[in-house]
Design a protein with these regions (language model features):
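Active-site metal-binding motif and surrounding structural segment of the metallo-beta-lactamase
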Residues: 1-20, 96-107
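Active-site metal-binding loops of divalent metal-dependent hydrolases
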Residues: 11-12, 49, 68-74, 110-112, ...
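Glycine/Thr-rich phosphate-binding loops of Rossmann-like dinucleotide-binding domains
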Residues: 16, 75, 116, 144
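Binuclear metal-ion centers of metallo-dependent hydrolases, dominated by the metallo-beta-lactamase
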Residues: 25-39, 97, 118-171
Length: 171
């Protein structure tokens, strides 16, 4: 089993491990707020997303990575104030669980669809978590939002990576 690649997926009403198609892949359906120890020594912790699925903390001997998935401070203009407050509270509660942790890399939403609130989630993350480098995601093919963030918050420039690159270019 050590030679298999592992994909960790959100729970869809199943607890068992199973193989689908290619026996080289092991699918593990996961719950939030759990710790999964893989055969290769990797540990995967999960947080509850306030949108869909889970966020992942992947700990290996080489380092630790955070992948937010859809966990973000989702504030939407035009939505009821109570809905926005609930999403913000849920996001902050999950980030408090990892407050003070160190990540070698993180993948965090920076979503231009949120208008003036596009950076609320990443700012809260940066203020509460230690991270060497952050790769913005969920920017809907609008990489200008990364430049906007770096311009508005130059103190984080050294840690934010522009994930828009040409085909074949490495990050």
């Amino acid at each position: 089993m050590d030679e298999r690649q592992v994909f960790v997926c959100k729970l869809i009403g199943k607890k068992e491990l199973f193989y689908k198609g290619d026996e080289n892949y092991l699918l593990i359906y996961v719950y939030h707020d759990q710790i999964y120890n893989l055969d290769n020594g990797t540990q995967v912790d999960t947080l509850l997303s306030n949108d869909s699925g889970v966020a992942f903390i992947v700990k290996t001997k080489e380092g630790t990575i955070y992948h937010a998935g859809d966990l973000n401070d989702w504030y939407w203009d035009g939505e009821p104030k109570a809905d926005n407050q609930r999403l913000t509270s849920a996001y902050r509660a999950e980030i408090r669980k990892i407050k003070g942790m160190h990540f070698d890399a993180a993948f965090v939403p920076l979503d231009p669809r949120q208008g003036n609130h596009y950076a609320d989630g990443i700012l809260y993350f940066l203020k509460n978590v230690d991270c060497n480098v952050i790769f913005p995601m969920h920017y809907w093919n609008d990489a200008n939002v990364i430049k906007r963030f770096i311009t508005e918050y130059p103190q984080y420039k050294s840690r934010i990576k522009n994930t828009e690159c040409a085909k074949g270019e490495e990050l």
